[in-house]
């Protein structure tokens, strides 16, 4: 069975990717399961550049496997696209959700709800071999609330309000989120591209 390494140790992300790709007959594993300890510098100027760099650095170590990597983040119109590619380290420390959310709320203080438009963006790269890769992007639009609402999810989820559900991402069930999230949209596009290679069904 062909192996796909997910270039992440984020358990939430790994679970979401495995769930959406379960129709394919692949052994999908995390970096930890492969005993890979690597910290790739995300110095690209776009989400897709960072995703490709992460995937390729790991592919160079395990050329017998395929590698899937994503880079995702939040873009806020009022902040000219920030936090963007710096979403995970917006407040200075990588992955400090609480501090990142506090900084975002403070920058948007006084901005009316209708001007708090935001997008969650996810770029995914699957490196198949040295010459072939698939690149896809998913996006969902919403608004930034003025306080954290909900306890599910991670990252900016408690601040990202989805008009379609009248809830934040952190109030959605896993199934609801997987049906509309930026990562779900990108993964569905990835599935479509993979099926063209006769990997599915």
Curated annotation (Swiss-Prot):
GO molecular function: dITP diphosphatase activity; ITP diphosphatase activity; metal ion binding; nucleotide binding; ribonucleoside triphosphate phosphatase activity; XTP diphosphatase activity
Enzyme class: hydrolase
Active site: 71 (proton acceptor)
A GO CC term attached to the entry: cytosol
Pfam family, one: Ham1p_like
Residues the entry annotates as binding Mg(2+): 41, 71
Positions contributing to substrate binding: 8-13, 72, 154-157, 177, 182-183
GO biological process: nucleotide metabolic process; purine nucleoside triphosphate catabolic process
CDD domains reported for this sequence: HAM1
Keywords associated with the record: Hydrolase, Magnesium, Metal-binding, Nucleotide metabolism, Nucleotide-binding
Domain of life according to the entry: Bacteria
Function noted in UniProt: Pyrophosphatase that catalyzes the hydrolysis of nucleoside triphosphates to their monophosphate derivatives, with a high preference for the non-canonical purine nucleotides XTP (xanthosine triphosphate), dITP (deoxyinosine triphosphate) and ITP. Seems to function as a house-cleaning enzyme that removes non-canonical purine nucleotides from the nucleotide pool, thus preventing their incorporation into DNA/RNA and avoiding chromosomal lesions.
Protein name: dITP/XTP pyrophosphatase
Organism: Clostridium acetobutylicum (strain ATCC 824 / DSM 792 / JCM 1419 / IAM 19013 / LMG 5710 / NBRC 13948 / NRRL B-527 / VKM B-1787 / 2291 / W)
């Amino acid at each position: 069975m062909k192996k796909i390494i997910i270039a992440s140790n984020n358990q939430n992300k790994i679970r979401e990717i495995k769930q959406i790709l379960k129709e394919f007959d692949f052994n999908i594993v995390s970096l930890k399961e492969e005993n890979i300890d690597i910290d790739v510098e995300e110095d690209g100027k776009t989400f897709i550049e960072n995703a490709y760099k992460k995937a390729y650095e790991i592919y160079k170590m395990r050329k017998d496997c395929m590698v899937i990597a994503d880079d995702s983040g939040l873009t806020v119109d009022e902040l000219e696209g920030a936090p963007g590619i710096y979403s995970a380290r917006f407040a200075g420390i990588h992955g400090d959700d609480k501090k990142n959310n506090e900084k975002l709320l403070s920058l948007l203080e006084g901005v009316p709800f209708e001007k708090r438009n935001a997008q969650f963006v996810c770029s995914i790269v699957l490196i198949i071999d040295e010459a072939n890769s698939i690149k896809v992007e998913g996006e969902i639009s919403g608004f930034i609330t003025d306080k954290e609402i909900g306890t599910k999810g991670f990252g900016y989820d408690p601040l990202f309000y989805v008009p379609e559900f009248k809830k934040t991402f952190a109030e959605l069930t896993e199934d609801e989120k997987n049906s509309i999230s930026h990562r779900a949209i990108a993964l569905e596009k990835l599935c479509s591209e993979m099926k063209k290679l006769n990997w599915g069904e």
